[in-house]
Amino acid sequence: MIQYLQVGKIVNTHGIKGEVKAIPLTDNPRRFNKLKWAYVSKEISNEMPKFDIVSVKHHKNFVILKFSGIDDMNAAEKLKEHFVIIDRKDAVKLPKDTFFICDLIGMNVFDTEEKKLGVLTDVLSTGSNDVYVVKSDNNKEILIPALKSVVKKVCFEDNKMVVDLPQGLIDDEV
């Protein structure tokens, strides 16, 4: 599993005192309130700078962050297009049968008869339930509802998901 999680993307500065505006990459932006520090980098690596978080504010669909040592707009400007990254051990604990999207991407998806349907490439949030986007070997997309009645098994050790597809969800050409 991935050690680091991107929880936000810095898209702009906010004001003149070094605050940045970030798009949350989490389903619950209030999680930022509990963060004491974060890495800030364009990509995940072993040399990401670590910043203490001085303050967190919420404005519309954004999170306004103030990092220690970033005290003016010029310093904040240099953080644009960077990600706010946390260590997995500092992530919120998920309820049973829920997963981080980054852990599902790339997973091989099979039906209950062990026929490979494809590889999970994306997760769509629809409001009522998520939908898994699975790309088949012949490049067709299969949209699979992320429901307990459909997803029968998720095995990270084998990088495998088993689904019981509702009748008529896919044609036989997949």
Curated annotation (Swiss-Prot):
Residues 96-169 form the PRC barrel domain. It comes from Acetivibrio thermocellus (strain ATCC 27405 / DSM 1237 / JCM 9322 / NBRC 103400 / NCIMB 10682 / NRRL B-4536 / VPI 7372) (Clostridium thermocellum). One of its GO terms (biological process) is ribosomal small subunit biogenesis. Keywords: Chaperone, Cytoplasm, Ribosome biogenesis, rRNA processing. SUPFAM superfamilies: PRC-barrel domain (SSF50346), Translation proteins (SSF50447). It is found in: Cytoplasm. NCBIfam families: 16S_RimM. Binds ribosomal protein uS19. The PRC barrel domain binds ribosomal protein uS19. This is Ribosome maturation factor RimM.
